[in-house]
Amino acid sequence: MTAHMADKPHLNMIVTGHIDNGKSTTMGHFLMDLGVVDERTIAQHAEESEKTGKGDTFKYAWVMDNIKDERERGITIDLAFQKFETPKYFFTLIDAPGHRDFIKNMITGASEADCAILVLSAKEGETDTAIAAGGQAREHAFLLKTLGVNQLIVAVNKMDDSKYSEEAYKKTVEKGEGLVKSVGYKLENVPFIPVSGWKGDNLVKRSENMPWYKGKTLLESFDDFKMAEKPVGKPLRVPIQDVYTITGVGTVPVGRVETGTMKPGDKIVVMPSGAQGEIKSIETHHTEMPSAEAGDNIGFNLRGIEKKDIKRGDVLGDPANPPKVAKEFLAQIIVIHHPTALAPGYTPVMHCHTAQVAAIMSEFVSKINPATGAVEEENPKFLKVGDSAIIKIRPVRPTPIETFKEFPEMGRFALRDMGATIAAGIVKEITEEHKV
């Protein structure tokens, strides 16, 4: 890893795919070929893997699992593991939904992704399972699109299993194209790359086993990703993560600026309380800042705001264009997980930016085709896994939320119950606003 890492633009990349399609092996091998993980580590994993009785199957996959375990245990590990660079960018790798909280984290912005890889398998039957209703590839593709991850690369893995056959690749591409198109991606913007996570073909080095493929390697294609514009020109929105009381300083809220900019002296309003005040100072990592903009994680001191007026889940904004607070809104959702079916009146917990609030699914307006938006059924009696629908939602207390069209960062949410994410969605329209 070189010293000029910080000078390159930084992108967060998320790796998704069905459980057995080899995403961890692919990324582990990729990191080894890049020199981010040394061969000694891989050899150690191979030895450990042999002990499981499955041969050295996991020698690459465990590179990613290492990160996951250690993350779950809360240890900060050698950053090189989950960071790598290309000639153009500096990437942080987020290994996707191995765990249940992943979807919630993505929606609430804890793990923000700029771009994604979807790993499919060229092995007979595996992609069919992955893209079927309830398959993880289908679920992940839907979520990526719903959550505003607009840049996608599809890696067609396990080419070594199909003896590097162009026909097997084409079959998988056809299925993969159907999937990414159905969730709303434009095919001309989604490259497909034949790879072998196990053998290393087309990860970093061009494969000699597929002379029929003339496109880029995985590494080369990463440099085609584009940097997203920071939403600094929009009105200020800062969802509050925590509020601390610091002796001698007073009330110090902490949060990430989602849109806009702020500086000491600015007038602000906190919603839903409607309390108004002024920014006294801003700091990040214990360093005072002259200003903050979209993307910055900050703590700040406010003049004129009492501790009782601000809490986690509130949103700070510009008094001239205050954060909206909804009593009811129209949403487009996709049902991800439920043992039976959802009926109107069901009340899961809504997670939106930093807010958590019980919310009633008060009315099912229509069931829709997610690819075209065409109505398939008016006023459905129930919704089941895989359904996309337009519904009305009433949070049990007024909640700061925005339409996805105006503020994508503030207009997406997860509905959770029994420790699982039941549905993910975006706000189409605020139908009843809470006025302070």
Swiss-Prot record:
According to UniProt, the name of this protein is Elongation factor 1-alpha
Family to which this protein belongs = Belongs to the TRAFAC class translation factor GTPase superfamily. Classic translation factor GTPase family. EF-Tu/EF-1A subfamily.
Region called G4, residue ranges: 157-160
Q: Which reaction does it catalyse?
A: GTP + H2O = GDP + phosphate + H(+)
Positions of Mg(2+) binding: 24
tr-type G domain boundaries: 8-232
Question: HAMAP family given for it?
Answer: EF_Tu_A (MF_00118_A)
One Pfam annotation, family name?
A: GTP-eEF1A_C
Instruction: Report the SUPFAM superfamilies cross-referenced here.
Output: EF-Tu/eEF-1alpha/eIF2-gamma C-terminal domain, P-loop containing nucleoside triphosphate hydrolases, Translation proteins
The UniProt keyword set, sorted, is: Cytoplasm, Elongation factor, GTP-binding, Hydrolase, Magnesium, Metal-binding, Nucleotide-binding, Protein biosynthesis
Record-listed E.C. numbers = 3.6.5.3
Annotated residues that bind GTP are located at 17-24, 95-99, 157-160
Q: Which GO terms describe its molecular function?
A: GTP binding; GTPase activity; translation elongation factor activity
Q: Where is this region: G1?
A: 17-24
SS bond partners: none
Q: Relate the protein's function as given in its record.
A: GTP hydrolase that promotes the GTP-dependent binding of aminoacyl-tRNA to the A-site of ribosomes during protein biosynthesis.
